[in-house]
């Protein structure tokens, strides 16, 4: 892969900072969008300066200043947006429409990677509210990209390990339970777990690959496609601790929404689609439909196995 110039929008965020690091590591000329107010956030500022020390260029631009966005995207071949679309952090998906307009006006961008990195919104048209809002808004952004004829790649990264592996996919915690574990349904629905650093590696691999132009790239590392019960079994073997398993029927799981915040309801809905309906694995990836799978495209990437990821929690 020859080096290219890359602008990361949202480069101080959870996934964005990893994508910046992967871009730098793979030798790309990397630009990071810096918003005017960042100087008042010491953690974000220090992270940006650490990227600068490693060779990244900081580009000041604002979503409220169209011309500044146009100037920023004119500097690069590839734009990657990693703005948050989860309710419990922030919800900025539709801000990307301003970025689409800037890319359209600039006319030089060879690839745009919008902020997706989760479940494929094109397959979530029947998702329940309020979590469906995320998918609907991502489809609005897709429509704008495609109507503007902007070359693009959609990344469907499935379940981030930090949120779904270390906690054995339990709600309300990020670390493994010590005595009992809630099993969703029978716990045998297949799920896909991906280390966030691997999400970044696969994303950067895709940006100059002609095979991924105007396609959806699914991240399905084969050894990380497993059921929740299989995930629990891996942890039990590593820790030597057998957990009490409590099966939660679908109707009881959905009842957890009652009395919760909108953000919590969205999260519960997403869990339901993943662990009860199997939305991540209940379809075949079909190249004829504009779909590719990352581990097949890039077998050289040594992705982190669930077994190895869990070792940090021992």
From Swiss-Prot:
Entries under Pfam families matching the protein: NmrA (PF05368)
Active site: 138
Positions annotated to bind substrate: 270
The keyword rRNA processing appears for this protein: no
Keyword rRNA processing carried by entry: no
Residues that coordinate or bind NADP(+): 10-16, 35, 44, 142
GO biological process, one term: (+)-pinoresinol catabolic process
Coiled coil: none
Highest taxon above the source species: Eukaryota
Xref: SUPFAM superfamilies: NAD(P)-binding Rossmann-fold domains
Keywords for this protein: NADP, Oxidoreductase
Listed GO MF terms: lariciresinol reductase activity; pinoresinol reductase activity
Catalyzed chemical reaction(s): (+)-lariciresinol + NADP(+) = (+)-pinoresinol + NADPH + H(+); (+)-secoisolariciresinol + NADP(+) = (-)-lariciresinol + NADPH + H(+)
Described purpose of this protein according to its UniProt entry: Reductase involved in the lignan justicidin B biosynthesis. Catalyzes the enantioselective conversion of (+)-pinoresinol into (+)-lariciresinol and of (-)-lariciresinol into (+)-secoisolariciresinol. Low activity with the other enantiomers. Abstracts the 4R-hydride from the NADPH cofactor during catalysis.
Subunit structure: Dimer.
Other notes: Unlike most other PLRs, this enzyme has an opposite enantiospecificity within the two reaction steps.
Protein name: Bifunctional pinoresinol-lariciresinol reductase
Species whose genome carries this gene: Linum perenne
Gene: PLR_Lp1
